[in-house]
Amino acid sequence: KENLGFSGGNNLGIQAAKGKYLFIINNDTVFKDFYIQALIDRLESSPKIGIVCPKIRFAWGANPIQYAGYTPLSKMTVRNRAIGFGEEDKGQYEIAHPTPYAHGAAMLVKREAVEKVGLMPLCYFLYYEELDWSMMFTRAGYQIWYEPKCTVYHKESQATGQNSPLRTYFITRNRFKLVQRNYGGIYKWLAYAYLFCVVATRDGIKFAFHGHWDLLSAALRGICDFMFNKQSYITK
């Protein structure tokens, strides 16, 4: 069977589902006292809300926070921060609020919003597709919210590995692709320059210094494939 990637697989599920709400959830998540009604209530609290994400905590150790919303992406570095990341959950993020981006590990989406916005973009295959999709929702006039009354526990990158060539390839290639699709004017060229001159150089030196030639090769292939509009690295 063909591997359609994160977006392709989710799009098949979205098209097959019949309900008013679409709950998109990673296969490496764990539920403990899961309260999905809180997500539904938040989603229905305003016609402007298109996506709601729960609080996400890591499924190991003391279950530190992984996600309590996101900060906006930098126009130059194409970086942002997950609010609360790595912090002990002491109840400091118990107020629901709008957030620029949904988290791909868990999100509840209005079907009517998807029908207006469109399906997940297929060009990423893995990583960054939820950020792009979030931007599509925002451009269509929808809000994305973080709802702390519901919590999901995430094992994080068990399927791909934190330092695998697969992950390195798609992270590298898709950063550029996100800029290509969503940035304009001077910001696009500043971001390209930063990714080429700073990020690619830094990562290349780091991989070479530690002898991670497979990661260096994957990163270089990611850059080349972006430049030639290709996708070639789909094995683990």
Segments and roles (model prediction):
Residues 1-17, 27:
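Glycine-rich, basic loop-to-helix element that forms the pyrophosphate-binding segment
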Residues 4, 29-30, 56, 124:
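Acidic metal-phosphate-binding loop of nucleotide-sugar-dependent transferases
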Residues 22:
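Short aromatic/hydrophobic "clamp" motif used to bind/position activated sugar donors
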Residues 25-27, 121:
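Active-site acidic Asp-centered loop
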Residues 30-67, 73-75:
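Conserved donor NDP-sugar-binding/catalytic core segment of glycosyltransferases
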Residues 72-100:
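Short, flexible, basic/aromatic active-site loop/helix in glycosyltransferases
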Residues 100-151:
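A short, conserved alpha-helix in the catalytic core of glycosyltransferases
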Residues 166-174, 185-236:
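Non-catalytic, C-terminal membrane-associated alpha-helical segments of glycosyltransferases
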